[in-house]
Each structure stands twice: as structure tokens, then as C-alpha cells.
Design a protein with these regions (language model features):
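Glycine-rich flexible loops
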Residues: 1-199
Length: 199
């Protein structure tokens, strides 16, 4: 809830299978627990850094999904090889640089957020146009206007990573799609004059 400056996040160490609404922890943007009896996720500081840096974000998902994590572990961006990718991501989904020993041994989770933000700033990317990132040697984070959209983007990211992996097996020299095809597919859904859908 951006107006109230509050974030609802999963509790640390509680298995998803047994998780209920009562387990959810509410924190403020400084990480102080406002509601709940459980400790918040160990990744809370990463989430808070992203909420502060990217005002359009209303929900964040961090996974270790198989195919996207392969790209993260390889330290590779996820290129836009086709229109499935271009419908959601306006270009390659970036992979961050490797974190330094000092960053990892220091405030690791906050520094994970910082390296994501640094990646977007240095590459001139916006979190609205590329609603996901791959953290090198770690895994993907995806986001959206709310939690439902964040999950949706995480699912699409995983499918795009799976298709990209197999595309490279068939065509190791495959290049990303042409910019005009990327523009056409992304902008018809997300541009100022979007034509996709009924609204």
C-alpha cells in the first residue's frame, strides 16, 4: 500500500504449502514490523529497495524457477528471441553483475536490491518496460502493479527463459528479434496508443 507506506510480505521459513493469511507480515518502508507475529522474509530489504527506487511497482515476486535461474547462474541476459518475450518485456531481461565479497558479507539483501537498481540505471532501463531482472548466481525477481501482475510476469519470464534456452540449442548464433518487431509487439500492448485488448 503505497499511500500508507506499507508492504505485506511472506514470513521467513514458513513453507508455502502451509502458509495462511495469518502468517503474512506487514512492514513499513524501513522494514519495521507493523503487523504480524512472524519474522518477515529474509529478502525484505531487497523488496524495500525496489519499492523505493521504482514507484510503479505494487508487487514483487522472487523465485528460483528452473529456466530463469539457469540464465542467472550463467550470468546471461535473457534476450528477446521472439514475440512471446516482446509482449511483456521491452528488450532483454538484464542479468546483474556479480556482487562483490563486501556486498555479500555486508548487508547482502539490501545490496542485492542496490545491484538491481544499479543495473537498471546503468543500462537506461525502466522497471515498467522490463518488469523483471536476473540476479547473477542467484535467481529472478519479477514485479508488477500488484502481486497478481508480479506473479504473471514471473510465469512469463520462466516460459521465455525455457524457450530461449531451447532456441539457443537449435540456433546458437540466433540474434534477438528486430527492433521494429519488438516495438510492434510491446507497444501495441503497452504503448500510449495501445490497441490490444477490449479497453
Amino acid at each position: 500500500d503505497r499511500e500508507k507506506g506499507l508492504v505485506a510480505i511472506k514470513p521467513s521459513g514458513v513453507p508455502y504449502e502451509g502458509m495462511e493469511e495469518r502468517h503474512i507480515v506487514v512492514v513499513d518502508l524501513d522494514g519495521r514490523v507493523v503487523s504480524g507475529t512472524y519474522r518477515p522474509s529474509t529478502d525484505t530489504a531487497t523488496h524495500l529497495a525496489l519499492y523505493k527506487a521504482f514507484p510503479g511497482i505494487g508487487g514483487i515476486v522472487h523465485t528460483h524457477s528452473h529456466w530463469a535461474t539457469i540464465f542467472a547462474q550463467a550470468g546471461l541476459d535473457l534476450p528477446a528471441y521472439g514475440t512471446t518475450h516482446a509482449d511483456t518485456f521491452y528488450g532483454s531481461v538484464p542479468c546483474t553483475r556479480n556482487m562483490t565479497r563486501e556486498e555479500i558479507e555486508g548487508e547482502y539483501e539490501a545490496n542485492t536490491g542496490a545491484v538491481i537498481i544499479e543495473t537498471f540505471q546503468e543500462r537506461g532501463l525502466t522497471a515498467d518496460a522490463i518488469p523483471a531482472v536476473l540476479v547473477a548466481d542467484h535467481g529472478p525477481f519479477a514485479w508488477g502493479r500488484d502481486a497478481v501482475e508480479a506473479v504473471h510476469h514471473a510465469v512469463i519470464l520462466e516460459e521465455c527463459a525455457r524457450m530461449a534456452f531451447h532456441t539457443r540449442l537449435l540456433r546458437p548464433d540466433k540474434q534477438p528479434i528486430d527492433s521494429f518487431l519488438l516495438d510492434r509487439h510491446y507497444l501495441r500492448k503497452h504503448g500510449r496508443t495501445a490497441t490490444y485488448g477490449q479497453g
